[in-house]
Amino acid sequence: KRHRVMKKHNKIIIAVPRGRILSELRIFFKKIKLNPDKSLFDESCRKLRFKSSDPSIDFIKVRAFDVCTFVAFGAAHIGIAGSDVIEEFDYSEIYSPIKLNIGKCHLSVAALKSLLVKEKPKSWSNIRVATKYPNLTKKHFAKRGIQVETIKLNGSMELAPALKMCRRIVDLVSTGKTLKENGLIEVEKIFNVTSKLIVNRSALKTNLEINKIIKKFLN
């Protein structure tokens, strides 16, 4: 009976994030000859699980912030996640062996332009910050001896200062255009962000096929 259960779940599941990174991943998968069903890249497609050119591998498409959770809890064996999400959740069950050098941007502190006219960031002591990354935000400011209250938002971060919820945000920055258009200035880069291959540690130890997939990504 146990053997049958294992057979039922013998497919390797790779979790990928929704959004703009999918176009970069499409090129990447083509290079390593691991091709998901084309519908994976169709934004209008409501399917969540997809077959691939390898019958032993299926893909699932989830929110970028959920990839790590699916992998950490074993629902997916492998995933593609941003280093921002990996660091925010810091799951012990996740191993991230390879930088993919796609989805590049950086995590930064930004503040209202009007605030920076009145005070310098060095003078900050007790602040409120809107962010999708409460753990990383607290860690960052704790290193500087700054007390921080975080407001957890999942998007439209730039609206929080405009509507007086706070005067500072921590968010991903690519070109800086969105910050500028909303009266914000980038104050400090926290770290550079890139996508990484992540693996469930238990699956890595028990499934030899996962090592073969990792080697494909290394090539």
Question: In which residue ranges do the predicted regions lie?
Answer:
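Domain-level signature for soluble enzymes in the chorismate/prephenate branch of the shikimate pathway
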Residues: M6-N219
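Short, Lys/Arg-enriched N-terminal segments with co-localized hydrophobic residues
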Residues: K1-V5
